[in-house]
Amino acid sequence: MLYRPFGSTGLTLSALGFGCGSIGGLMVRGAYPDMRKTVARAIELGVTYFDTASMYGVGQSEVNLGAVLRELGQEPNSDIIVGTKVRLKTDEMTHIEHAITTSVEASLRRLGRESVDLIQYHNRIGPNRTAADPEANLDDLAQIVQTFEKLKKAGKVRFWGITALGETDALHAAVDQGGFHSIQSAFNLLNPSAARPVAADFPYQNYDGLINRAAARGMGVIAIRVLAGGALSGASERHPVAAPSVNPIASAPTYETDVQQARAFQFLIDEGVVENLVEAAIRFVISHEAVSTALVGTSNLEQLELAATYAGRGPLPEEVLGRL
């Protein structure tokens, strides 16, 4: 397993992170013995970062991850780094500190921990606070950071970050304002714009080098949607435990279109560079040195084993990257 520094936190993360969300689905809808077996194997393979959220399975992912880690003897302050997230509703934006504190304390109870290594703000960033899924503006972020700082003083969190989804200009402004330790950013073969220049007529959201900007400011970078919700497998079929449908982020309007677009990378298989598109997707993301960890959700042990194998093969050759 490869390891990367997590920004300026002093933490070191495995290049492959273990996603506990609904898309892969294992930690939300899987059988508990399968969860335990897969998490245990991930730790054996050198995975050190596990990412969950209060909204995954309405808290069930946190409950399951916490129970498995305790059963495996992985207590806080071990080499295992746990991150979770807080998401606010529209009516909670008027009392941010109270809402975040309440949410974090509930997450800690579900995880069965007194503290969490990384807490992340899970709402979009932008000017619209009246939407059903309210965005946070720069003033909100300043208050959110102050709340996280208080939670750190109370011994409930160690570090904090944001999920960098929303308007591109607002995301860059948030990174420039700073005050947090990390970002999660969509970055994959279908939309590499968070790290690489794209054409003026690029059809999807252009993140305009966001993760480069964050890394330059000492922030850790967690790449999300590494497999575009599974579309970068090149197959439409979903595992029974996985989310039955996926809403694309910063790529095509539909999952099926993403699957079709993924097949454009078939040449990497034909040339013997990779075994399959999943390998191409994972190795592409970890080829970018600003990425601290590539977050991949799994549905079963086999998928985890393959993801770890592919991550262990390291970045794609420079010559290949130049053609992508």
Kindly label every feature range from the protein language model.
Residues M1-I80, N188:
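N-terminal binding-site loop/beta-alpha segment at the start of enzyme catalytic domains
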Residues F6, F18, A42, F50, ...:
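Conserved, mostly hydrophobic/aromatic
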Residues L11-L16, G46-T48, Q74-I80, G112-D117, ...:
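Short, well-ordered coil/turn segments that N-cap beta-strands
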Residues G21-P33, V86-A99, D133:
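Active-site mouth loops of central-metabolism enzymes
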Residues R29-A42, H95-R110, G166-A174, A281:
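Short, acidic/polar
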Residues E62-T84, D140-G155:
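Alpha-helix-loop-beta-strand connector modules within alpha/beta enzyme cores
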Residues L108-P134:
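Active-site groove signature of glycoside hydrolases
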Residues R124-L324:
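Beta/alpha (TIM)-barrel catalytic core signal, keyed to glycine-rich beta->alpha loops juxtaposed to Asp/Glu
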